[in-house]
Amino acid sequence: MLRVTTLASSCTSFPLQVLRRRLTISSLTSFQPTTKTQVVVIGAGHAGCEAAAASSRTGAHTTLITPSLTDIGKCSCNPSIGGVGKGILVKEIDALDGLMGKVTDLAGVQFKMLNRSKGPAVWGPRAQIDRELYKKYMQRELSDKKAHPNLSLLQNKVADLILYDPGCGHKVIKGVVLDDGTQVGADQVIITTGTFLSAEIHIGDKRIAAGRIGEQPTYGISNTLQNEVGFQLGRLKTGTPARLAKESIDFSALEVQKGDALPVPMSFLNETVSVEPTKQLDCFGTHTTPQMHDFLRNNLHQSIHIQDTTIKGPRYCPSIEAKILRFPDRSSHKIWLEPEGFNSDVIYPNGISNSMPEDVQLQMMRLIPGMANVEILQPAYGVEYDYVDPRQLKPSLETKLVDGLFLAGQINGTTGYEEAAAQGIIAGINAGLLSRQEREQLVLKRSEAYIGVLIDDLINNGVIEPYRMFTSRSEFRISVRADNADFRLTPIGAQLGIISPVRLSQYSRDKHLYDETIRALQNFKLSSQKWSSLLQANIAPQAENRSAWEIFRFKDMDLHKLYECIPDLPINLLDIPMHVVTKINIQGKYEPYIVKQNQFVKAFQADENMLLPQDYDYRQLPTLSTECKLLLNRVQPLTIGQARRIQGITAAALFELYRVARKPSQPVM
């Protein structure tokens, strides 16, 4: 965790402006808002829910503002949480005492660990959820005054921001103005508006002003950020498939995908999930057909969404139109039919998002096996929206141009519930700490968390298409895993005072059992000959005795097998929870590789400890190329390590940066 010191502005006072209504207040002292709080969170999607809860856990008085309290926690697209890479983000959010993992365990209808056939470093916890239960339990969490005594929920729509210009090149946030003219004063504001900024929905050739079907977009915030403050904004697009009537689908000949016999909870607080293993709902697999592809190709001209190639959609979750254009030789694409809840008659067809006219959608759907008589309950659509170039953010997710303004979620160019929630919890923690005059900010390193990788990628390289998390993005994935997220991050959260006593107690108990068990295994040593005899295996002889911990490196070896084969092993397996046993088994397998990786981590950390001056004008370094000067001035990297990861920064430029860098103990240049 990097500790960032934030200094208060000492600039001369200039008038305060409520930019949407052009209200000008003569001085900062004369500003009298209708109501006052410490942190305002705009939007109650996945980023907003985590941001509001995290901010309140710091002790900051927090107000979550949303147009509809009944839509808090609404899942706009797929009815699932987690997956490869994404599931690790959920575990990290949970380790910081976030909500997503706990709510998923309550609302899940099917749990499955993806990538089981591969190494544990790339396992992906995933759950199908009941949409209505997810909303219900998320709303219950946020309304729990015992858990979040400092959190208030306000049903209203934010029209614009209230900014103060001290005249020193950047502004200061002072609150928001609502649609009804109410001014809410705040020390920090977090924008988590998802796909609602200047958004429009596309169905065929129709353009509809909406951020989600049936819900109006917001324009004032985009206008203020771009035209009044000077943020660089861009446009991205995404889409969602049609919702189908369950009774109109013939599942009899389709592939069945069941949940795991022993579901693995998303939250470290839980040993089990709410749904009984035998009562998990099935998913069903089908596929597109050549006939459907031909039909769709003949109708692509009817979609304005797919015709606009200047605005990028998600590469790794493309629409069916994009798949057919990108992979013309493929005769079929997989579709998973996912249930939307225990009592729901709605099916979500994962893998066939599109923006075709409604009549075309119905005809093409009926060319898919099992769906000859399918009925569409809600049409598929594409959505196009504004995002802010994330290179204008600090690692804390505070903006560089407006003090106290934080951005989280799809507004930063990401896609996915989990990526949004991960940003939300970091923005919420840091906004809350800042409002309480805390000098520390939570900035996770790439070597500490996938959240660190996510934010580091965004702020250094920006996005040209919606960003999605994968395990391949992390250089440290053998040590930064789903199973050990609590051991990595809960102590960091505890230092900041954001971890509940219940979670901290469980973490301490699990860590003690983990450490004691590994210590016992390291101290229990036998000769290679004795190990061979006990395990009925061929253990190569060596001069020194081998510890039980070393034996973990052998294929098919785990704690249960050791316990069964060695009566004298000084542990009681019955006293160790299954999730701790899993941690020990995985750590034992990866231990030799982690030792090697730690050498790389040390080299990585050396560059992370070389600090660069803040607000430095790199144009004064004559040996830098024009491109490098522009990149460095835009990103304003905090360290040599961060500068190294900016695309376009050359080795020669890095050599020059070492001249202006300093170690933490040295004064700022």
UniProtKB/Swiss-Prot annotation:
Species annotation: Saccharomyces cerevisiae (strain ATCC 204508 / S288c)
Subcellular location: Mitochondrion
Keyword Ribosomal protein: no
UniProtKB keywords: FAD, Flavoprotein, Mitochondrion, Transit peptide, tRNA processing
Cofactor(s) for this UniProt protein: FAD
Subunit text: Interacts with MSS1; forms the heterodimer MSS1-MTO1 complex.
Recorded superkingdom: Eukaryota
This protein's name: Mitochondrial translation optimization protein 1
Keyword Mitochondrion: yes
HAMAP family associated with the record: MnmG_GidA
GO MF term set: flavin adenine dinucleotide binding
Family membership: Belongs to the MnmG family.
Transit pept. (range): 1-59
Gene Ontology annotations of biological process type: mitochondrial tRNA wobble uridine modification; tRNA methylation
Classification via Gene3D superfamilies: FAD/NAD(P)-binding domain (3.50.50.60), GidA associated domain, C-terminal subdomain (1.10.150.570)
UniProt GO cellular component terms: mitochondrion
PANTHER family, per database record: GLUCOSE INHIBITED DIVISION PROTEIN A (PTHR11806), PROTEIN MTO1 HOMOLOG, MITOCHONDRIAL (PTHR11806:SF0)
Functional description taken from the UniProt entry: Component of the MSS1-MTO1 complex that catalyzes the 5-carboxymethylaminomethyluridine (cmnm(5)U) modification at the 34th wobble position (U34) of mitochondrial tRNAs.
